[in-house]
Amino acid sequence: MHEPTQSAIPAPLVRPSVAGRLMDISITADIDPTAEIGPGTMVWHLSQIREYATVGPNCILGRGSYVGPGVILGKNCKVQNFALIYEPALLEDGVFVGPAAVLTNDRYPRAITIDGVRKSAEDWVLVGVTIRTGASIGARAVCVAPITIGRWATIAAGSVVTKDVPDFALMVGTPAKRVGWVGRSGVPLEQTDPAHFTCPATGERYRELEGKLSLL
């Protein structure tokens, strides 16, 4: 019988306790000692959490995900496999980041200065992506900092977001444009009259005014 190689065997989760709070963390995860991980959070195989990052309680960080220095994640966030969250990103509660999505941090990237010298940290002006409560970033989407993704917004898979996104917006394309609205359930809303929308999943009603949507 063929025996699986060591690399083919999934890395087990361990349950470290910090001040009596349990977490599920893969033994292959790379977590800086200065990072803070909330209770109930799961960190999977080959994930990396950098120095002074904060991950709230009950989050899930998928295989190969990356959380940069000083990044902040609220509670109940889900970061899927190979998603990259670069500093100084801020994710509020309940944010979803899909597989291989990227949150950038350099508006005008260059490897070298105009003198041909390799850039150092001192030459780098960091800008971040802020994602508000309940928003979702689809697989392989790119959020180009500095931008803010509004509450409960949805960014479709593969989209490239270069501008701020309003609450409840459904954004599609490159560059991403609003093609509709979504409710808190994530389901696209149905328009009932020129200014009102209903969620077919929950029955919640919304009103659009001057390009912004609010829950009634």
Predicted regions and their residues:
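Internal alpha/beta core interface subdomains
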Residues: R151-T154, V160, Y206
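Short, non-ligating residues that shape and space the ligands of small metal-coordination modules
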Residues: Q191-T192, R207-E210
